[in-house]
Amino acid sequence: MMDKMKDMKTKKRTLKKEEKKESETEYVIRAENVDYTYEGSKIKALDHLSLNIRKGKKVAVMGGNGCGKSTFFLCLNGIRRPESGRIFIDGKLIEYTKKGLLDVRRKIGIVFQNPDEQLFSSSVYEEISFGILNMGADEETAEKAVRQIIEELGLSAFQEEPTHALSGGQKKQVAIADILVMHPEVMILDEPAAALDMKHTKKVNEMIERLTEKGITVLIATHDIEYACGWADEIVLMHEGKVIRHAETMEICQDEEALKEAELEIPTVIRMYRKLTEKKILSDKEEPPRTWEELESRLT
């Protein structure tokens, strides 16, 4: 009898360990009580921040200026080192050694709001080649991968152009290709549509969609709630270095109180939908539309 009870307890412990392991590997990013303060500041940029991001999701990280979203991204990529707390990438704790940071940067690519900060090579082709060669690929493998990415992303027309001569939209496309050629698990984009016209915004959005089709987890920092509403699977709201809400996109987009705390407003498309339901023009039984195109289709 005692032996049977011991066996049952052992099995329960094993199952719990397996369940924990499965739940941990479900998350490509886990941040636990992360703190960061910039030198000379008394205010924490990150204040006991905790957050889990599941694999393959499109996640918008939002909040007012100084909320900590850009600092969090820099910590994820190893550019900044938290003063306390832990960050796990694909279940592995970030180690702030040369080898550990190299491993992190293989897994996580970051595209800054201003791509001029990360484009240094004389031509587009050389720029996209640089990262993969620097990571140790031989020239033949690198050339094949770069040609494939250039073709796939439609960059052939200006692959020999100097990067400094490109438009802002083209530079952002090259910066994305520069990371994508290395097959990251996570892509981080800081304000991907900032300062772009409609044409280049559309192209950048198409590139982001290709990332998610490849199973890459995509995180963006943005102030644009309309953009996030139409694009993201989930939204993370931040304020004063903390995560104040993390949920599926439509939950967040209808949570007026949480949005207000994050210095945001309910998307105008949802406000319009509410007015139309109040006037009985549309039914309130459906989930609100994410985009103006979706709203228009319901009216036709």
Cite the ranges covered by each PLM segment.
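Helix-to-loop junction immediately C-terminal to a conserved catalytic motif
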Residues: 77
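ABC ATPase NBD Q-loop/coupling interface
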Residues: 86-103
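Conserved ABC ATPase "signature" C-loop
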Residues: 240-241
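A short, flexible loop at the N-terminus of ABC-type nucleotide-binding domains that lies
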Residues: 16-28, 35-48, 97-100
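Conserved ABC ATPase "signature" region
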Residues: 140-158
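Catalytic Walker B motif of ABC-type/P-loop ATPase nucleotide-binding domains
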Residues: 187-190
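Conserved ABC ATPase signature
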Residues: 162-166, 170
